[in-house]
Amino acid sequence: MKTTFLEFEQPIAELEAKIEELRFVQDDSAVDISEEISRLASKSQQLTKDLYANLTPWQVAQIARHPQRPYTLDYVREIFTDFHELHGDRTFADDLSIVGGLARFNGQACMVIGHQKGRDTKERALRNFGMSKPEGYRKAKRLMELADKFGLPIFTFVDTPGAFPGIDAEERGQSEAIGHNLFVMAGLKVPLIATIIGEGGSGGALAIAMGDSVIMLQFATYAVISPEGCASILWKTAEKAPEAAEALGLTAHRLKALGLIDKIVNEPLGGAHRDPKSMATMLKRALAESLRQFQGMKTSELQARRHERLMAYGKFKETEGR
């Protein structure tokens, strides 16, 4: 698949287009231009390194939304085996913006749950662009409770702009569904390992992300609101999204410094979409390390640790004024 370049990546796009053009010419030419192609390829790689070493929070937000970025089912195919998808919330409907089911991780039975956005227009509409309704969160809750019943560790993958804000979702109890999920996750007797793989948007993300360990990909985001939404509220225009992204502190390194996530998994040069298989390999290693941390831990110890973790959020110190 041809790489889609973001607006701030246009200098890289121009170089890659030139390289592609030279490769096409070389196929029908007796002149050897492989040296020039190699030179431009090295230049493109260095430019990518320089650009990605100095990303702004707004640029990171754009990478997190990249249309070719790996989604939950992409990681499921690469990381897990024997995946068997389970459907429906047993109350209203089957929300396809959340996928989940039984699988094996390194041979061990587990439960996998995650947001799924969709690749083309038809699938995006079918999956509601990854914005879940109450039935999606209730499906996730059902699968968590099933895993808890059979003693299976839970892996969740977060990638959503946020919970669906439609009237029908509110009528069916959107906030109650999210709140109930938080209640269930707090009391699980099995470990839950959450990974932010793209957008982590507000309560819609938190509804499946209250893990014993929270992992975040290098160019993923996690915030209470989207930069555009924040800008529209504070400045009455979405054009201030870059400033809002800076103020929200939505990047992995900022959140790690605040103690809100536990681990950052570096992405391949240019983002996860440039090399999905390598990204999946690195993430699988991180998931295995996190799971080992909780294996053999008593239920009481696991729950006590989780309680301490949750109670530690929002701590602050007061300093005397001068």
Curated annotation (Swiss-Prot):
* Single GO BP term: fatty acid biosynthetic process
Q: Give every CoA carboxyltransferase C-terminal domain span.
A: 39-293
Pathway(s) annotated for this protein in UniProt: Lipid metabolism; malonyl-CoA biosynthesis; malonyl-CoA from acetyl-CoA: step 1/1
The record's listing under Pfam families reads: ACCA (PF03255)
> Could you tell me what reaction this enzyme catalyses?
N(6)-carboxybiotinyl-L-lysyl-[protein] + acetyl-CoA = N(6)-biotinyl-L-lysyl-[protein] + malonyl-CoA
Please give the subunit comment from the record.
Acetyl-CoA carboxylase is a heterohexamer composed of biotin carboxyl carrier protein (AccB), biotin carboxylase (AccC) and two subunits each of ACCase subunit alpha (AccA) and ACCase subunit beta (AccD).
Q: What does this protein do?
A: Component of the acetyl coenzyme A carboxylase (ACC) complex. First, biotin carboxylase catalyzes the carboxylation of biotin on its carrier protein (BCCP) and then the CO(2) group is transferred by the carboxyltransferase to acetyl-CoA to form malonyl-CoA.
Q: What is this protein called?
A: Acetyl-coenzyme A carboxylase carboxyl transferase subunit alpha
Organism the protein comes from: Ralstonia pickettii (strain 12J)
Taxonomic placement: Bacteria, Pseudomonadati, Pseudomonadota, Betaproteobacteria, Burkholderiales
